[in-house]
C-alpha cells in the first residue's frame, strides 16, 4: 500500500472556521478578539518590513513592489491593509467559504487582492515566490507544523521575511486563551483552540531553522483589559510573534 501523502490540513479545523465565515468582518462578533489584535500585528509587520526593505513606514504605500502571501488568511483581515499599504497580495485559505467571504468584502471595499482556496503545499508545488509571508494565528490549527513551515519557507524569496503569530503552550495560556477566552468570557467559540496543538517558541524556532530560516526577532503580545487594547511585551507566556528571514546566498557563504 502506498504511503499516505503528508498534509498540513486538519479537516476539523477547516470545518470549524468555515462555519464562522460570515462573522469575519463583524468587529463585535465572534472574531472581535482578532479585530482588537489587528493593530498590534499591523504595526509589527509595517515597522519590520520598512526597516528590512529600507522603506519609509510613514509613506502612503511603503509596501509598493513587494509581493505578500497571507497564508490561512480567513476573511482577509490582514490582506486588505497589506494591499492598502501598496503590496501585491495573495490571500490563501483551505476554506473555500472563507475565501468567498474575503473576495466579497474586498470587492465591496474596492481593494484588489488575489484570493485562492489553496493549501501551503499546493501553492509551493506551483512554484509561487513571495517577499513576505504572513503566517498569523495559523500554526496552532495545522495538522503538521514542520511540513507547513517547510512549504511556506519554500515560497519565500532569499532575503524575504516570514511573520508568525501564535499561542504558547503553557498553563497560563490554557487559563487565559482557552478557559478564560472561550469558556468564561466567551470571546471565542468553544473549541477554537486545543491545548495540545499550541506551539512553544522553541518548537516554532526549531521548525523555522529546519526550514532554513533565521529567527530575527520575537515579542510577546498582552491584552490590557483597562484599555481594551493589545500591546507588545516581553511576556511570551500566552500570545507571541516571531520574525524570521530566509538568508541570501551571499549571507550563507
Curated annotation (Swiss-Prot):
Residues the record lists as binding S-adenosyl-L-methionine: 41, 72, 93, 136
Annotated Pfam families: Methyltransf_23 (PF13489)
Reaction equation(s) it catalyzes: a 3-demethylubiquinol + S-adenosyl-L-methionine = a ubiquinol + S-adenosyl-L-homocysteine + H(+); a 3-(all-trans-polyprenyl)benzene-1,2-diol + S-adenosyl-L-methionine = a 2-methoxy-6-(all-trans-polyprenyl)phenol + S-adenosyl-L-homocysteine + H(+)
UniProt enzyme class: transferase
Gene Ontology annotations of biological process type: methylation
Enzyme Commission number(s) of this protein: 2.1.1.222, 2.1.1.64
InterPro entries: SAM-dependent_MTases_sf, UbiG_MeTrfase
Domain of life from the UniProt record: Bacteria
Gene3D superfamilies tied to this protein: Vaccinia Virus protein VP39 (3.40.50.150)
Biological pathway: Cofactor biosynthesis; ubiquinone biosynthesis
GO molecular function, one term: polyprenyldihydroxybenzoate methyltransferase activity
Keywords linked to the UniProt accession: Methyltransferase, S-adenosyl-L-methionine, Transferase, Ubiquinone biosynthesis
Statement: the UniProt record of this protein carries the keyword Transferase: yes
SUPFAM superfamilies linked to this entry: S-adenosyl-L-methionine-dependent methyltransferases (SSF53335)
Function: O-methyltransferase that catalyzes the 2 O-methylation steps in the ubiquinone biosynthetic pathway.
Family assignment from sequence similarity: Belongs to the methyltransferase superfamily. UbiG/COQ3 family.
Protein name: Ubiquinone biosynthesis O-methyltransferase
Amino acid at each position: 500500500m502506498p504511503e499516505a501523502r503528508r498534509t498540513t490540513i486538519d479537516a476539523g479545523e477547516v470545518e470549524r472556521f468555515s462555519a464562522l465565515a460570515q462573522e469575519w468582518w463583524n468587529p463585535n462578533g465572534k472574531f472581535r478578539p482578532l479585530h482588537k489584535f489587528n493593530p498590534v500585528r499591523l504595526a509589527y509587520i509595517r515597522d519590520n518590513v520598512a526597516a528590512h526593505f529600507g522603506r519609509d513606514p510613514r509613506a502612503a504605500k511603503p509596501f509598493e513592489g513587494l509581493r505578500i502571501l497571507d497564508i490561512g488568511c480567513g476573511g482577509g483581515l490582514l490582506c486588505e491593509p497589506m494591499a492598502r499599504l501598496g503590496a501585491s497580495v495573495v490571500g490563501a485559505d483551505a476554506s473555500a467559504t472563507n475565501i468567498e467571504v474575503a473576495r466579497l468584502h474586498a470587492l465591496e471595499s474596492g481593494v484588489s487582492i488575489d484570493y485562492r482556496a489553496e493549501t501551503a503545499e499546493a501553492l509551493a508545488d506551483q512554484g509561487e515566490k513571495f517577499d513576505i509571508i504572513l503566517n498569523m494565528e495559523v500554526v496552532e490549527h495545522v495538522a503538521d507544523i514542520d511540513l507547513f513551515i517547510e512549504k511556506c519557507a519554500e515560497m519565500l524569496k532569499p532575503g524575504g521575511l516570514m511573520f508568525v503569530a501564535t499561542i504558547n503552550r503553557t498553563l497560563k495560556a490554557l487559563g487565559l486563551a482557552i478557559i478564560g477566552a472561550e469558556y468564561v468570557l466567551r470571546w471565542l467559540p468553544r473549541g477554537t483552540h486545543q491545548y495540545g496543538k499550541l506551539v512553544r517558541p522553541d518548537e516554532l524556532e526549531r521548525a523555522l531553522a529546519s526550514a532554513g530560516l533565521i529567527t530575527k526577532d520575537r515579542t510577546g503580545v498582552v491584552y490590557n483589559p483597562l484599555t481594551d487594547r493589545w500591546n507588545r511585551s516581553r511576556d511570551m507566556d500566552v500570545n507571541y510573534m516571531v520574525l524570521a528571514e530566509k538568508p541570501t546566498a551571499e549571507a550563507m557563504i
